[in-house]
């Protein structure tokens, strides 16, 4: 099988089988899998993702589309830098070596990529365009720098996004995260929050789960900003944001974030306050707030109620108010908010109910002075109007989404093209001096960014005044590169950032395939970038991905030895119901079935399994055992079964090719109907990504043809036609063996160039159908009925079946439930 696979991979390469032109006379289809990080080896999770995309690409080609199916590398990132530190090498050497190795792995799997369009994000010829684009955005004031409180990883010595902090620790290093103020560069994604939110509903071919996640991440809240005067400091106020201002008479405290400016201005920091602030600083995202026990500490300050000067409210630093949402301050209404209630109970604060029901059971305001009797919506508008009349508040909209911090304090990334001059201030690098490339002579003898300490690269002359200046030593967040790469595939040799003519033809991406873990960062940033690129006339679209498919993960059992060390599956052998170490024969504990990961070693080596079976067998298994959107559990017996199926096809060819047409002595109409039925439904299944169901249908057709061969009287012509069709249907899934059999069947045209089989509508109606026969809901038999039979006849036949009579034992059934053409359930 390996020789066959190598043969066809060589032919495809020589014939430039998957090299596609920008031919606008043809209907286009752009299918794209998320580009991988070149970590060293392709894993089975990657293979599932790419196999799904390859089925779609090959199928759409056979449907007559001009298909763009490219591949590239998301090549910047921290792992390369860490590898350089560990191995005393250069990140670029490690990265390019991995790319070369992983590319060979992908080619060995027979994926139909147009490798002439390959991109590499660490190539200066790629990232020079994003440096120029950054400067264009800077000129439009869509880029700015400010001092910001950041999550600092003291081990990796870099800033982490909130999403990269898990339970207060760095997602890679595991170090406890510190809070620091650093100058950071930001992109104004919040300028586009409303459009990003509104257009989600137009993404009809995206999973609902992803759309909801993006909506929640953007997090639009409509309410009011208003001010509370601080008692004894009545020239000072605390501004709060509220989505429920109608509950203002139920307020019992003001909650502020641990880093609210008022703390530095007016509050005397006791040890209790200082310790609480330190504790709060470890909470980095709102998802952690929900899990945290609600706590607070009194500041010593009070504010005056805006509508009743006799009501004085304490100001409390809380662990559930964030400075980067709203104003960093809220008024707490414990009777009508779960978090406020939890804190009020703990701190013995008043709990005043201000919403009740009237005699019609409609919610109305109570205990609220001039708001009493109004509905919540009426009261809300009246309160906001009152704030505006008094000049202490105004209507406002807040978003959970914050501007995108793009600065990273690492070497292996795209340099930010900015120069700092004592005379001229911030100076953009002139376009003619792009790209700003990374130096080759760097030292990784400590964990600090080597750009910061480089003796020559950092020091330059100012482009404006020619005096001494220094470069920006931060690099771009690596999401910067992956936010526009899909546009570069349209023409990766374009002089500018994009080839607008090619982009107009290919974009948007028709189907984008990748993991749901990218729902709110990569996918949101890519949508944002597309809008920016549209405004700069690089692309004509404002949404990058017409369709999105999120595949499930590949799972495997985990194993540990007696010393609690993780073991690879290849190191473990099963004996009965127990597991043992292959070399030491010591007992091994099987743990949970989890996502394959290097850290827990529950990974399958691609080359080992490929050598044992074949690329086609791997492709078939990762597509057949579970719906593509669901998780897949790796199974040795499963891939073994797929390998047997492929060998069965080869054996069937040997038998079928020996059959002579003059041996035809039986017309099998039902087999012919099944062939046309399979053509139609396999095509439909591929279009809806029901790939496991498509494979099941093709297995059914395979078995039907195999059974026909075994009969004394056979329909040779239908068998040969059906086998030809079967090989064609299977080609997008297992391309190597099907190309081989197709050629041996005498077909002159390459299979990858052929037109997908067409079905005859008139052949789709079957003269019989099979029904399941149940007794008390349990399957006891099946029976094949003619399509023209009545329901009464169906019931009569089923109760008289020998297997059913055994359960009836001479009695009459109490009831017969019939689901037409599917199930008969006999109740006794």
Swiss-Prot record:
It comes from the Bacteria. One of its GO terms (biological process) is leucyl-tRNA aminoacylation. One of its GO terms (molecular function) is aminoacyl-tRNA deacylase activity. The keyword ATP-binding applies. Its EC number is 6.1.1.4. One of its GO terms (cellular component) is cytoplasm. A motif ('HIGH' region) lies at residues 36-46. ATP binds at residue 598. It is an enzyme of class 6 (ligase). It catalyses: tRNA(Leu) + L-leucine + ATP = L-leucyl-tRNA(Leu) + AMP + diphosphate. Keywords: Aminoacyl-tRNA synthetase, ATP-binding, Cytoplasm, Ligase, Nucleotide-binding, Protein biosynthesis. A motif ('KMSKS' region) lies at residues 595-599. It holds the Pfam family Anticodon_1. It is found in: Cytoplasm. The keyword Acyltransferase does not apply. Belongs to the class-I aminoacyl-tRNA synthetase family. HAMAP family: Leu_tRNA_synth_B (MF_00049_B). NCBIfam families: leuS_bact. This is Leucine--tRNA ligase. It comes from Rickettsia typhi (strain ATCC VR-144 / Wilmington). The gene is leuS.
């Amino acid at each position: 099988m390996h020789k066959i696979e190598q043969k066809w991979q060589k032919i495809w390469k020589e014939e430039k089988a998957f090299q596609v032109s920008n031919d606008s006379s043809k209907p286009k289809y752009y299918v794209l899998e998320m580009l991988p990080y070149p970590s060293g080896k392709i894993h089975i999770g990657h293979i599932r993702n790419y196999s799904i995309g390859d089925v779609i690409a090959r199928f759409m080609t056979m449907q007559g589309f001009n298909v763009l199916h490219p591949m590239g590398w998301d090549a910047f990132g921290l792992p390369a830098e860490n590898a350089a530190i560990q191995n005393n090498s250069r990140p670029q050497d490690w990265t390019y070596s991995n790319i070369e190795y992983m590319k060979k792995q992908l080619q060995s799997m027979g994926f139909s990529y147009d490798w002439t369009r390959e991109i590499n994000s660490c190539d200066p010829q790629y990232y020079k365009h994003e440096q120029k684009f950054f400067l264009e955005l800077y000129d439009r004031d869509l880029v700015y720098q400010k001092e910001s409180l950041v999550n600092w990883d003291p081990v990796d010595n870099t800033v982490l996004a909130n999403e990269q902090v898990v339970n207060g620790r760095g997602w890679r290093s595991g170090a406890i995260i510190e809070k620091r103020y650093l100058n950071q560069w930001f992109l104004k994604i919040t300028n586009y929050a409303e459009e990003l939110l509104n257009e989600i509903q137009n993404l009809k071919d995206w999973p609902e789960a992803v759309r909801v996640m993006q909506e929640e991440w953007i997090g639009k809240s409509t309410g009011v900003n208003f001010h509370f005067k601080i008692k004894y400091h009545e020239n000072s106020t605390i501004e709060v944001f509220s989505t429920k201002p109608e509950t203002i008479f139920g307020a019992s405290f003001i909650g502020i974030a641990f880093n609210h400016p008022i703390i530095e201005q007016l509050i005397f920091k006791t040890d209790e306050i200082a310790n609480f602030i330190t504790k709060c600083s470890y909470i980095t995202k709102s998802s952690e707030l929900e899990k945290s026990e609600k706590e607070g500490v009194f500041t010593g300050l009070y504010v005056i109620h805006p509508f009743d000067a006799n009501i004085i409210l304490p100001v409390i630093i809380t662990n559930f108010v964030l400075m980067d949402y709203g104003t960093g301050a809220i008024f707490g209404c414990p009777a009508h908010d779960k978090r406020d209630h939890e804190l009020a109970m703990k701190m013995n604060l008043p709990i005043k109910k201000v919403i009740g029901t009237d005699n019609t059971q409609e919610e109305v305001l109570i205990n609220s002075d001039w708001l009493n009797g109004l509905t919540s919506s009426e009261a809300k508008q009246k309160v906001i109007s009152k704030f505006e009349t008094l000049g202490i508040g105004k209507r406002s909209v807040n978003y959970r989404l914050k501007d995108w911090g793009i600065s990273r304090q690492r070497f292996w990334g795209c340099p930010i093209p900015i120069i700092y001059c004592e005379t001229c201030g911030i100076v953009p690098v002139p376009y003619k001096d792009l790209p700003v490339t990374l130096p080759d002579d760097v030292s990784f003898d400590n964990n600090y960014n080597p750009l910061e300490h480089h003796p020559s690269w950092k020091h330059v002359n100012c482009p404006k005044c020619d005096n001494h200046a220094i470069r920006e030593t931060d690099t771009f967040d690596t999401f910067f590169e992956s936010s526009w790469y899909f546009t570069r595939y349209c023409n990766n040799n374009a002089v500018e950032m994009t080839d607008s003519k090619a982009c107009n033809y290919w974009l948007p991406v028709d189907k984008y395939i990748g993991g749901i873990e990218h729902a709110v960062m990569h996918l949101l940033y890519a949508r944002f970038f597309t809008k920016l690129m549209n405004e700069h006339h690089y692309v004509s679209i404002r949404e990058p991905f017409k369709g999105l498919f999120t595949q499930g993960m590949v799972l495997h059992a985990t194993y540990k030895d007696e010393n609690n060390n993780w073991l690879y599956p290849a190191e473990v052998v099963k004996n009965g119901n127990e597991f043992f170490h292959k070399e030491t024969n010591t007992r091994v504990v099987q743990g949970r079935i989890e996502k394959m990961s290097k850290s827990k070693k529950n990974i399958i080596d691609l080359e080992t399994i490929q050598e044992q079976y074949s690329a086609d067998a791997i492709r078939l298994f990762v597509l057949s055992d579970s719906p593509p959107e669901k998780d897949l559990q790796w199974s040795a017996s499963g891939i073994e079964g797929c390998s047997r199926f492929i060998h069965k096809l080869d054996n069937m060819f040997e038998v079928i090719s020996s059959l002579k047409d003059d041996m035809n002595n039986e017309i099998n109409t039902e087999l012919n109907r099944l062939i046309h039925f399979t053509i139609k439904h396999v095509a439909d299944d591929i279009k809806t990504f029901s790939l496991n169901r498509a494979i099941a249908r093709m297995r059914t057709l395979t078995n039907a043809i195999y059974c026909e061969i075994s009969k004394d009287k056979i329909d040779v012509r239908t068998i040969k036609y059906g086998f030809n069709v079967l090989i064609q249907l299977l080609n997008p899934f297992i391309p190597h063996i099907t190309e081989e059999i197709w050629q041996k069947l005498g077909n002159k045209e390459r299979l990858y160039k052929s037109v997908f089989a067409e079905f005859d509508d008139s052949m789709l109606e079957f003269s019989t159908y099979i029904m399941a026969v149940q007794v008390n809901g349990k399957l006891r038999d099946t029976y094949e009925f003619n399509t023209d039979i009545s329901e009464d006849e169906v019931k009569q036949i089923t109760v008289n079946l020998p297997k059913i009579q055994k359960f009836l034992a001479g009695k009459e059934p109490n009831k017969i439930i019939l689901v037409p053409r599917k199930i008969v359930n006999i109740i006794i």
